[in-house]
């Protein structure tokens, strides 16, 4: 009998052949959980594209949610700042709503959702607007789009901050609000949030 621990160890060590061998014997492991998450979650957060392809090809659930945060693999990838993996999973059909698309920097999807959905651009999810999430995760192009579609930079987040204050906090603390992001992505995040602060001041001086 194959132990799930062996399976997850193989996934996390990027042992493609071993994972393929294990799944051939016990495909039910695709839905197994380790610390509340599936193998696809771990492959996504590790930016292991080959492993993700293998798992999806074997039938892994692209939109499975972890037990702790109710996040899908694309959400895990975003938390780690794995932008390429976010796009990779999105292109393969990962479910993404307006707030998530703003946080993930999926400009084309944000544009489509704003154009075709009836959900207000300033709607809240967990106390956050799409505009605030775009600022938090450093996506200037998404911020500009949402501002042009009526995004309100003066709405306050769960910590009482405006969108400008969110961007400035990310710059001041070097991305402390997104602690899991890799160092190289964090440097980019700080630069992007600085650009977002400039955009907000230019478009909405009272922000």
Predicted regions located by residue number:
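Ankyrin repeat A-helix N-terminal signature
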Residues: 9-15, 42-48, 76-82, 100-106, ...
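Extended, hydrophobic interaction surfaces within ordered domains
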Residues: 46, 53-89
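Alpha-helical protein-protein interaction modules
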Residues: 28, 98-99, 103-109, 113-119, ...
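Ankyrin-repeat boundary/"N-cap" motif
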Residues: 2-7, 31-39, 65-72, 95-100, ...
């Amino acid at each position: 009998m194959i132990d799930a621990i062996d399976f997850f160890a193989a996934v996390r060590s990027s042992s493609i052949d071993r994972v393929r061998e294990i799944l051939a014997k016990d495909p039910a492991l695709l839905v197994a959980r380790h610390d509340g998450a599936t193998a696809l979650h771990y492959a996504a957060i590790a930016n292991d594209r080959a492993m993700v392809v293998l798992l999806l090809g074997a039938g892994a659930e692209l939109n499975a949610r972890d037990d702790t945060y109710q996040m899908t693999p694309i959400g895990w990838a975003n938390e780690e700042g794995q932008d390429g993996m976010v796009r990779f999973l999105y292109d393969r059909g990962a479910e993404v709503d307006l707030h998530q698309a703003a946080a993930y920097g999926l400009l084309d999807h944000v544009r489509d959702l704003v154009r075709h959905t009836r959900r207000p651009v300033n709607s809240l999810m967990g106390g956050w607007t799409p505009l605030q999430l775009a600022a938090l995760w450093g996506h200037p192009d998404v911020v500009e789009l949402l501002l042009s579609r009526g995004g309100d930079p003066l709405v306050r987040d769960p910590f009482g901050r405006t969108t400008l204050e969110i961007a400035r906090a990310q710059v001041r603390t070097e991305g402390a609000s997104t602690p899991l992001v890799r160092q190289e992505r964090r440097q980019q995040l700080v630069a992007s949030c600085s650009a977002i602060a400039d955009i907000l001041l230019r478009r909405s001086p009272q922000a």
